[in-house]
Amino acid sequence: MIRQETMNLLIKYFQDYPELKGIPASSEEIKHSENILGIKFHDDYIEFIKKFGGASAGLDIHAFHNSTLVGEETVIELTQGFQKLLELHEQPMNKLYAISDDGSGNPILMDQQGHIFIYYHDSSEMEMLYESLDSLFKETLLGE
């Protein structure tokens, strides 16, 4: 769960930078995309996108109606692109979904426990970046 202290920080951040916030996701959109992808999103991701939509808060986090600065790709499109990439590399990895990318074609992924990874498409290696969205926001917005 995203801690209340972190959530308050995010609320203030998006008040200061409203152009970085998307349109909040609905429960129907979330369920529909989970069904399409065959994945259950982590509660932290759901909490974030229900409040802020696809938004940029230290990392661009894609949902359905993203801030124009995040781009138009949805979590569904990013995840399906990641799944195709894995098929090319013959590395089945289910239960991961793409919430972002690093700008070089490497998807940023979240697992069902809320851990955040980067998948290096050139080497087919994965590295954990953050234990949770909460730790991502603390590090990127507070520098902790």
Residue map of PLM features:
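A surface-exposed partner-binding patch
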Residues: 1-107, 141-144
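Short, highly charge-biased, low-complexity peptide segments
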Residues: 64, 121-124
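Short, solvent-exposed loop/turn segments at secondary-structure junctions
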Residues: 103-106, 115, 123
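Short helix/loop capping segments that flank catalytic or ligand/cofactor-binding pockets
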Residues: 107-109, 127
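Short acidic-glycine loop/turn motifs at beta-strand connectors
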Residues: 111-113
